[in-house]
Amino acid sequence: MKRVAILGSTGSIGVQALDVVGRFPDRFEVVGLAAGRNAPRLLEQIRRFRPRVVSVCDEAAARAVRAEAPPGTEVLSGDAGAVAVASHPDAAFVLAAISGGAGLRSTAAAIEAGKPVGLANKESMVLAGELLMARAAAKGVPILPVDSEHSAIHQSLVGHNRGEVRRLILTASGGPLRCTPEAELATVTPERALKHPNWSMGDKITIDSATLMNKGLEVIEARWLFGVEQQRIDIVVHPESVVHSMVEYVDGSIVAQLGISDMRGPISYAMGHPERMPLDLPPLDLGRLGKLTFEPPDPARFPAYTLAYRALELGGTAPAVLSGADEAAVAAFLARRCSFTGIAEVCADVLEAHVVEPVRSVEQALAASEHGRREAEKRVGARAHAPAGR
């Protein structure tokens, strides 16, 4: 029986992780849950899984949960609450799935507490990947990726000598706008950009998929998770989302992981590692699928992913600033205050204006991300009030 804590339990990944837990009640026990403000969903999870401790993002939500939670459930709030769940002494595994930079402190706390981490919060690696991997190595803590691409790379590295890796190849679906002409992208609506053809995800990551910023952030994540320089990490667009990523070795051989587009696959791989669990999911029928297609990404239409390579080149706080700027720009797009193409333009402006510093602490990384967010919000506001034709 593995005792688990799930951070971000009411989000897309958290809900699917609890679905996996529910399928294997003899393998997992939930000891802690951390959520945002969705008190009704958290209460449903509490009643079903009976965790010992839960946390929500603020005290108002905590009061609502305390009023209805079963006796014996400790209800905490804020960053301190999420950190307490992540470092709970009874947790033997922590699934880190809080979206955005908000998940960094709790992910770092799990590592410091010596907990194996299933990492679904890529922003933690983007903001402070070098720092977190150094602490994980010092603590002897395994970090198992939950992103489908990084899970695929992890699986494709098993049994191989990492010194023989030539490059990592991250696949991208291309998102809902892959075939949209460049001239139409500026007028794309949030509703259209949110219609992902293959994956069921939260709004922010779905927009990042549409801009290809998500793939750029995954390049940064892969840089630190696998210790491979960005010059040896490539992106290929693969619309079917069947090949989840690949590893090319020095002899030219390519090892890939294939599967259906269902996040419960990589979630169960991380949670059950080193064992695989028999999931009752539809099989991948390659004969019926017929073909797999691949194409290079188009930096002219989707320049956002190139900013991640630029951020790694700049180093230090640059990736954290880019991540914060992207969070603000995506939020502005969803609120109809920024155009679709404006997301990458705002992020590029913020990144190039940033004065880079080395990342020495989690708090410094968070401050850099917040700086990126503020600078992006300023630019969104300035663009909204710019004279027509400017």
UniProtKB/Swiss-Prot annotation:
List of residues binding NADPH: T10, G11, S12, I13, G36, R37, N38, N121, E123, G202
EC annotation from Swiss-Prot or TrEMBL: 1.1.1.267
Region (Disordered): 367-390
Annotated positions binding 1-deoxy-D-xylulose 5-phosphate: K122, S148, E149, S173, H196, S209, N214, K215, E218
Pfam family, one: DXPR_C
Compositional bias of kind Basic and acidic residues: 370-380
UniProt keyword terms in alphabetical order: Isoprene biosynthesis, Manganese, Metal-binding, NADP, Oxidoreductase
Molecular function GO labels: 1-deoxy-D-xylulose-5-phosphate reductoisomerase activity; manganese ion binding; NADPH binding
Catalytic activity reported: 2-C-methyl-D-erythritol 4-phosphate + NADP(+) = 1-deoxy-D-xylulose 5-phosphate + NADPH + H(+)
Coiled coil: none
Keyword Metal-binding part of the UniProt annotation: yes
Residues reported to bind Mn(2+): D147, E149, E218
Needed cofactors: Mg(2+); Mn(2+)
Cross-referenced InterPro entries: DXP_reductoisomerase, DXP_reductoisomerase_C, DXP_reductoisomerase_N, DXPR_C, DXPR_C_sf, NAD(P)-bd_dom_sf
Cystine connections: none
Purpose: Catalyzes the NADPH-dependent rearrangement and reduction of 1-deoxy-D-xylulose-5-phosphate (DXP) to 2-C-methyl-D-erythritol 4-phosphate (MEP).
Family note: Belongs to the DXR family.
Protein name: 1-deoxy-D-xylulose 5-phosphate reductoisomerase
Native species: Anaeromyxobacter sp. (strain K)
Record gene name: dxr
